[in-house]
A protein has these predicted regions:
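Hydrophobic, well-ordered secondary-structure elements that form the walls
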Residues: 119, 153, 199, 222
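A conserved short coil-to-beta-strand element within the FAD-binding core of flavoproteins
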Residues: 101-103, 118, 122-142
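Short, surface-exposed acidic
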Residues: 87-100
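Flavin (primarily FAD) binding-site architecture
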Residues: 2-5, 154-172
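Core beta-strand elements of the Rossmann-like FAD/NAD(P) dinucleotide-binding domain
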Residues: 142-151, 155
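Rossmann-like dinucleotide-binding core of oxidoreductases
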Residues: 1-90, 124-125, 147, 176, ...
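Short beta-strand to alpha-helix junction loop
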Residues: 68-77, 102-114
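FAD-binding beta-loop-beta segment adjacent to the flavin cofactor pocket
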Residues: 111-116, 169-200
Length: 240
C-alpha cells in the first residue's frame, strides 16, 4: 500500500505526486533497536524475551477497547494520531490536507513514522483528491488538476474483506464462496464455511484485527486445522 512504498519512492524519484482520496489516521511505529545492555540481559536470561513478548501482546490487547468504540480509548487513539501529524508536519496547509474529516476507526488506522516526512520533501506533492482518469501520460485528479507522469503506481491497499480466491472456490451447491459471502462473510472460528466441506481458510472472516499481531491468529488457526486433519485421519472421515 502507499503507506509502505511512498517513503521509498520519494527517495528515488526526481518528483512525485501522491493522490489521496481521503486522509488516513496515522499513529507512530514504535520500532527501535535494542541497546547493548538489553541484549546482554536477554543473553543472560532468555526468559526476559518471553516476558517482553507477553508484555507487547497484552499491550496490544488493551487496544481492543478502541475497536469496541469505548469513548475514552477512541479519544486517546485520535489524540495520538493528530499529535503525530502535528509533530511531523509543520506546514499548516499540508497538515490540513492530511487531517481526516471523519472519526477515527471508520477505516483502518495506519502505522508509520516515515510517511508524513516523505510528504514534506521538496520533490513530493500531495494531491488531496482521487485519481479520476488517465489520458496518455497525463493523470487527472477528481478536482481537475493534471499531472504529467513517467510512471503510474497503483497503491490502493488490500482487499481484506473480499479475498480474490473466493471466486475460484465452489461448494456443494455449485455456488462460489464469493457469492455465498455476498450477504456477509461468516465462518466457524473464521476457518470453516458451511456448505464448503474440506475447506479451511487462514485469515478468514473477521480475523483482520487492527489491535494486535495477526500472527497469533494464524498460529491458532493452523492448530485448529491440524487437529481437524488428525481427527479425519484417525476416524477415516472423508468429509469435514
Amino acid at each position: 500500500s502507499a503507506i509502505q512504498i511512498v517513503p521509498e519512492l520519494a527517495r528515488l524519484a526526481s518528483s512525485m505526486v501522491v493522490f489521496q482520496r481521503s486522509a488516513p489516521y496515522l499513529i507512530p511505529r514504535a520500532n527501535r533497536s535494542y541497546t547493548a545492555a538489553e541484549k546482554r540481559l536477554f543473553s543472560r536470561d532468555p526468559s526476559l524475551m518471553h516476558k517482553l513478548r507477553a508484555d507487547l501482546f497484552w499491550t496490544g490487547e488493551t487496544n481492543f477497547a478502541q475497536r469496541r468504540n469505548v469513548p475514552r480509548f477512541v479519544r486517546e487513539a485520535k489524540d495520538m494520531a493528530l499529535s503525530h501529524l502535528h509533530d511531523q508536519v509543520a506546514d499548516p496547509a499540508l497538515r490540513a490536507k492530511l487531517t481526516p474529516d471523519y472519526e477515527i476507526g471508520c477505516k483502518r488506522v495506519l502505522i508509520s513514522s516515515d510517511y508524513y516526512p516523505a510528504l514534506t520533501r521538496d520533490n513530493v506533492q500531495l494531491e488531496a483528491s482521487a485519481l479520476a482518469r488517465v489520458e496518455g501520460n497525463t493523470a487527472i485528479s477528481a478536482d481537475g488538476r493534471r499531472y504529467e507522469l513517467d510512471v503510474l503506481v497503483c497503491a490502493t491497499g488490500f482487499e481484506a474483506t473480499r479475498p480474490p480466491f473466493a471466486k475460484a472456490i465452489h461448494g456443494r451447491q455449485g455456488i462460489s464462496l464469493d457469492a455465498h459471502w455476498d450477504q456477509g462473510m461468516q465462518g466457524l472460528d473464521s476457518i470453516a464455511v458451511h456448505g464448503f466441506p474440506n475447506l479451511f481458510i487462514i485469515n478468514g472472516p473477521n480475523t483482520g484485527l487492527g489491535h494486535n499481531s495477526v500472527v497469533y491468529i494464524i498460529e491458532a488457526q493452523v492448530d485448529y486445522i491440524l487437529d481437524a486433519l488428525e481427527h479425519a485421519d484417525r476416524h477415516h472421515v472423508a468429509v469435514l
